[in-house]
C-alpha cells in the first residue's frame, strides 16, 4: 500500500519491512538497526506503549497511536482508526454526520471511532459488551434508540471470534486476512487509514496530490 501511494507521488527508493516487537525493549532494539526515514503501522501492544516511549502527545481519551514516522530523526505519531472509519463509511455511502452508529466495545479502536463520529456530528448507540467504553468527548453524541444506520462489534473474544448480530441497517467488521476481498469494509478502512496517515504524517504538504480511496483500492486489487 505504501509502495502504491509513493509511486503515485513519484517517490523512489521505498522498501517494505516487517518489524515484530512485543515490548518496547524489542522495538528499541529492532528500530535501532534501521536507517533513513521510517513509517510504521503499529498494533497491540506497541500502539499503547509507543506514545510514552517516544514522548508523543496523544489524546488521553484514546491513549494509543497506530501510525508513527521517523523523518530526519524526528518522531511523530497519530491514531487513524476514527478518521479511517469515517472515510470508509463515506466510501460505502454512509454519511456519519447524519447517521447513527451502534457501537460495541471500549478499547482504543472503539474510543477513536466514537471520538471521530461524535466530532463529525453523528449519533452513537452503545451496545453492552465485555468492556464498556469510558466517558469521553463522545458522551454528547450518545442516544437511547433502537434505530441505527451502521453497527460494529469491537468486543469479540480474545484472539478474535465471531461478532454478535447487532440491530442496524448494515453491520461491518474490521477483521481481515490475506484472502479478504478488496471490496470488504475492513480493507476499505485500512486503505482509508493509510491515506489519512499520508495526510497527517508523511506528506501533509502533498494532500492534494494523493490518490483517492477508490483509486487506491483499485490498485490494490490489481496488484493482489
Stretch-by-stretch model annotation:
Residues 79-82, 89-122, 126-130:
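Glycine-rich adenosine-cofactor-binding loop
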Residues 20-22, 42-45, 105-107, 127-130, ...:
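Structural motif
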Residues 70-71, 122, 166-170:
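A short helix->loop->beta-strand "cap" motif at the edges of active sites that frequently abuts
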Residues 136-191:
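Rossmann-like adenosine-cofactor binding region
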Residues 1-92, 178:
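Phosphate/diphosphate ligand-binding glycine-rich loop within oxidoreductases
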Residues 170-224:
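Adenosine-phosphate binding glycine-rich loop
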Residues 17-27, 128-147:
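A short, well-structured beta->alpha microelement
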Amino acid at each position: 500500500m505504501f509502495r502504491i501511494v509513493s509511486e503515485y507521488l513519484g517517490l523512489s527508493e521505498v522498501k517494505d519491512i516487517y518489524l515484530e516487537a512485543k515490548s518496547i525493549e524489542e522495538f528499541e532494539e529492532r528500530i535501532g538497526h534501521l536507517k533513513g526515514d521510517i513509517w510504521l503501522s503499529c498494533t497491540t501492544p506497541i500502539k499503547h506503549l509507543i506514545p510514552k516511549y517516544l514522548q508523543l502527545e496523544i489524546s488521553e481519551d484514546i491513549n494509543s497511536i497506530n501510525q508513527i514516522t521517523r523523518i530526519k530523526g524526528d518522531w511523530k505519531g497519530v491514531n487513524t482508526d476514527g478518521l479511517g472509519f469515517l472515510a470508509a463509511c463515506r466510501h460505502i455511502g454512509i454519511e456519519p454526520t447524519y447517521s447513527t452508529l451502534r457501537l460495541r466495545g471500549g478499547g482504543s479502536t472503539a474510543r477513536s471511532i466514537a471520538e471521530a463520529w461524535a466530532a463529525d456530528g453523528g449519533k452513537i448507540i452503545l451496545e453492552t459488551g465485555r468492556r464498556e467504553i469510558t466517558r469521553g468527548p463522545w458522551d454528547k453524541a450518545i442516544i437511547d434508540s433502537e434505530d441505527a444506520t451502521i453497527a460494529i462489534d469491537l468486543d469479540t473474544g480474545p484472539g478474535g471470534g465471531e461478532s454478535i448480530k447487532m440491530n442496524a441497517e448494515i453491520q461491518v467488521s474490521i477483521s481481515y486476512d490475506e484472502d479478504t476481498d478488496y471490496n470488504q469494509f475492513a480493507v476499505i478502512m485500512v486503505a482509508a487509514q493509510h491515506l489519512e496517515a499520508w495526510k497527517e504524517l508523511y506528506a501533509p504538504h502533498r494532500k492534494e496530490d494523493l490518490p483517492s480511496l477508490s483509486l487506491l483500492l483499485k490498485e490494490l486489487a490489481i496488484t493482489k
